[in-house]
């Protein structure tokens, strides 16, 4: 029998009116917990609102140690336990005000320059800039690819003002922001933009593999008004990687099967994803090594697949993160087939793995100049190293960036190669540390991992028992 589902059609103007009448209420609480700041958000529910909130905190490089999320379908209530990167509570009044304004404005047009100017610290720009032209590049990864791309851009007079590059499962995705190296400002001339695209196409097709399709997409940002194709850079990278199918053959660890003992399960830091039906929802459990922005990446994957998070809880025990989501499809359905569940598992594993810190992390800080990215990546390539992930941006006269490097086969870098890179780049390198993907945190006492495994129960079911008390406390804000 065919199942027919009816959904009410809500006019966008009415939906906007509801948001204006009931804007998000954000409370920053430094009294309830001695070790972290509680950010409590109470707002009208809207598809994608959870990702918008997590994005604000992630862009500030705040550490989310725990979070509780609940929705009754029309109203959304969240509590985030956060600290700064050093494990301290948030006490800066300008930062607290910025968080309150940014979460509210995320539903009404985004963060303004005035809001950023009032914040007494730098916020890394993770959105399309209205002063530059953005190029998106995806395709097969190979050693030296970023070096080739940046060299071509330098040769044709394009100044890279910011760039983010990810590699995963032999795929590469990049978002590069350019300005005219001769005249400054965005590249406006259509002929000039076409020229840049042609050169990038040539680089990507230089090692073309039969059956593969590489893409170079120009996304233009207008100098005035709302940018065309406005997007958050890291969200866009997730979308690009997903579009490239990097999630195929991404398998989670199966060490929870009968073949593995409790000791191994307790120590395993690989990615585990389990999905089961629970009270009209699909319950998704994620367990993996903790790292910065893990919550952002998993929520981003769920949003990309058009799932709605109704309830969730996330936290960490030592170096292990555990997350549990109660989700439905955007159309109200749940995951009914094993094929649907397997696809979600693959996509979550891919989203978590894309940002995994592979190799040695080189942090640079130097003078902003034409061809800087080309110079740095050339030195890395000429010393037999490969870049697995990179992020660079300019702040006035200064350029800062981080580059994760391995040998050409993806193995650990040798000390001689690293010394050569540091020597050639000179004072530009401010640190070189092994990227272990761990977030700084104060370590509290935890029970033995085996005992934790024996006592393992659904953290979501524990959450249900606290949900009524949580809802009451938030509504009293």
From Swiss-Prot:
InterPro entries per record: ACR1-12 (IPR040217), ACT-like_dom_sf (IPR045865), ACT_dom (IPR002912)
Cellular component, GO annotation: nucleus
SUPFAM superfamilies noted in UniProt: ACT-like
Transmembrane segments: none
Keyword set includes rRNA-binding: no
Cellular location(s): Nucleus
Tissue-by-tissue expression: Expressed in flowers and siliques.
Entry keyword set: Nucleus, Repeat
PANTHER family xrefs: ACT DOMAIN-CONTAINING PROTEIN ACR1, ACT DOMAIN-CONTAINING PROTEIN ACR4-RELATED
Name of this protein: ACT domain-containing protein ACR1
Organism: Arabidopsis thaliana
Gene: ACR1
């Amino acid at each position: 029998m065919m199942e027919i589902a009816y959904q009410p059609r809500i006019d966008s103007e009415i939906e906007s009116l509801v948001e204006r009448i009931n804007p998000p209420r954000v409370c920053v609480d430094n009294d309830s917990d001695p070790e972290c700041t509680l950010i409590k958000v109470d707002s009208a529910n809207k598809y994608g609102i959870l990702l918008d909130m997590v994005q604000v905190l992630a862009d500030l490089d705040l550490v989310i140690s725990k979070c509780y999320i609940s929705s009754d379908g029309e109203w959304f209530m969240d509590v985030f336990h956060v600290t700064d990167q050093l494990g301290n509570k948030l006490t800066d009044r300008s930062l607290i005000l910025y968080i309150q304004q940014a979460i509210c404005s995320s539903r009404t047009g985004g963060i303004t320059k005035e809001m950023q100017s009032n914040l007494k610290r730098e916020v890394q720009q993770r959105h399309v800039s209205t002063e530059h032209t953005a190029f998106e590049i995806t395709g097969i990864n190979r050693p030296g690819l970023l070096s080739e791309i940046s060299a071509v851009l330098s040769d044709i007079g394009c100044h890279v003002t910011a760039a983010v590059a990810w590699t995963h499962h032999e795929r590469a995705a990049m978002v590069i922001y350019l300005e005219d190296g001769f005249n400054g400002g965005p590249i406006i001339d259509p002929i000039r933009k076409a020229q840049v695209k042609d050169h990038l196409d040539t680089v990507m097709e230089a090692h073309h593999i039969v059956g593969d399709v590489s893409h170079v997409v120009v996304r233009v940002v207008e100098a005035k008004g709302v940018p065309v194709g406005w997007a958050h850079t890291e969200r866009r990278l997730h979308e690009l990687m997903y579009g490239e199918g990097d999630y195929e053959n991404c398998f989670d660890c199966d060490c929870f099967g009968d073949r593995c003992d409790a000791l191994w399960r307790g120590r395993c830091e690989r990615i585990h994803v389990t999905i089961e039906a629970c009270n009209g929802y699909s319950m998704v459990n994620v367990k993996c090594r903790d790292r910065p922005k893990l919550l952002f990446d998993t929520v981003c994957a769920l949003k990309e697949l058009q799932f709605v998070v109704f309830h969730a809880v996330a936290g960490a025990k030592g170096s292990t993160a555990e997350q549990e989501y109660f989700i439905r499809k955007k159309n109200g359905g749940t995951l009914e087939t094993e094929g649907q569940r397997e696809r979600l598992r693959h996509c979550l594993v891919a989203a978590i793995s894309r940002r995994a810190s592979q190799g040695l992390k080189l942090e640079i800080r130097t003078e902003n100049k034409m061809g800087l990215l080309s110079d740095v990546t050339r030195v890395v390539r000429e010393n037999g190293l490969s870049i697995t992930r990179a992020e660079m941006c300019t702040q006035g006269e200064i350029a800062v960036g981080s580059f994760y490097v391995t040998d050409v086969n993806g193995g650990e870098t040798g000390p001689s190669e690293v010394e050569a890179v540091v020597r050639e780049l000179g004072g530009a390198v401010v640190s070189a540390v092994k990227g272990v993907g761990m977030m700084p945190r104060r370590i509290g006492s935890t029970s033995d991992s085996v005992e934790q495994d024996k006592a393992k129960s659904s953290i979501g079911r524990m959450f249900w028992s606290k949900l009524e008390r949580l809802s009451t406390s938030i509504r009293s804000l």
